[in-house]
Amino acid sequence: MLLPEITLTLTALLSQFFAVMLQGKNRIVANITILLTILTIFIILKYSYSESVLYLDYVMFTTNANIANYKAIILIFTIISMIIYRDYSVRSGEPLKFEFITLILLSTVGIFVAISAQNFLLLFCAMELTALTSYILAGFKLSDIKSSEGALKYFILGSLVSCLSLFGISFIYGFGGSLQFSDIFYKLNDSSSVNLGLVIGVVLFLSSIFFKLSSAPLHFWAPDVYEGSPIASVTYFTAASKIGAVAILLNIENLIIKNYHPISYNLIKIIALLSMIFGALGAIRQTSLKRLMAYSTILNIGYVLIGVLLRTEDGNKAAMLYMLIYAAASIGFFTCLIMLLGNQTDKANFESIQGIAENHKAIAAAICIIMFSMIGIPPLAGFLGKYYLFYQAITQEEFLLAYFGIFTSVIAAFYYLKIIKTMYFAEKPNPTKIPISYGLLLINFVVIGFLLFGSFIISS
């Protein structure tokens, strides 16, 4: 049951050991680590599909087919982030610091444990492991003041949210007498009495998950962290980390708040609406492409929360499918920027992509496909994700959520189209020659293929 987590932890620690011992061989060790991480995917697919439970006087840890799928998807995006860091270090001429790969792997271990946790305290500890490594990943560029500033904001706000989360756990134990998901589920759904203290405890605990999702109003850290963090860290935060947070939320939703108390339901609904509003409007005035993508993430997390609020199996599937499609599109966009700008990617803005279509037609076309998918143009995968999500919302008579989703999608189309306009209709002062990176090229090829043909594969 714990084989994927054990394998990943050993891979991280042993790889770091060999990276220290074999000075100057970091790139070789990185390639071996990536191969071992790919092996972990096969371990997940082979040994984690059957339902099993770990007991330590009570249920602490569980796995099943859904959880195994989540872990496999997260690990795929983790591997992509590792490849991006490896190739970016080559293109930028910076030395490959193996600690980065170790931190990403340990963060993923925390996500894995959190997804399988059946106890609030275990879930908190797992999320803290992910949070602590994420703070370091955000501030990994020690020479960059913006990186340090973003990491410091991330750490301070994250620490505050962790305190709220622990405060919520104390409420849960005090009013519920247990930290087990199953026990709290029973008490929350006991129609004979409404335990307001228990509801408050759950809501306080959920604040840590909403912070990790960068959903409004807990989103203010995201633009600064995205702007200052290394591009490989940003890809990890946008894809693997966000998918993990959504999986944790769906796990809690299934076991604890399937029948929402009105307080928690309305609170999550407000968070979804605020995320859509802040995400759509906040991105309009941005000039930095990384800050723009931070607001885009906030907006799209609002869409994901629509699926969570529906409280149905189809709603959960719609939420995770949409998150997967958005994560793939974001990865594709960032890899295009790296291929185009090299060591200037971390300072990418609209001026950086002016007129690139004239000299770099393939990259411009790839970005076009990605932007159209984010807008939701058929028959791209982004259209399928939005259609499925909004259709489920309308079916469940959540008209306000659906209307807000459609309205903010129209607003978001403005800045996605602005990127396309800048590439094709602005003049590029000095054309640059781009060296080929086969790792990034392969990632982009897979992403574009998924966005183009994913809707046909998924619908069939």
Curated annotation (Swiss-Prot):
The keyword Cell membrane applies. Its EC number is 7.1.1.-. The keyword Lipoprotein does not apply. The chain crosses the membrane at residues 2-22, 28-48, 65-85, 104-124, 155-175, 196-216, 230-250, 263-283, 292-312, 321-341, 363-383, 400-420, 438-458. Its main location: membrane. NDH-1 is composed of 14 different subunits. Subunits NuoA, H, J, K, L, M, N constitute the membrane sector of the complex. It is an enzyme of class 7 (translocase). It catalyses: a quinone + NADH + 5 H(+)(in) = a quinol + NAD(+) + 4 H(+)(out). Coiled coil: none annotated. It comes from the Bacteria. GO terms for biological process: ATP synthesis coupled electron transport. It is found in: Cell inner membrane. This is NADH-quinone oxidoreductase subunit N. It is a multi-pass membrane protein. One of its GO terms (cellular component) is plasma membrane. Disulfide bonds: none annotated. The gene is nuoN. NDH-1 shuttles electrons from NADH, via FMN and iron-sulfur (Fe-S) centers, to quinones in the respiratory chain. The immediate electron acceptor for the enzyme in this species is believed to be ubiquinone. Couples the redox reaction to proton translocation (for every two electrons transferred, four hydrogen ions are translocated across the cytoplasmic membrane), and thus conserves the redox energy in a proton gradient.
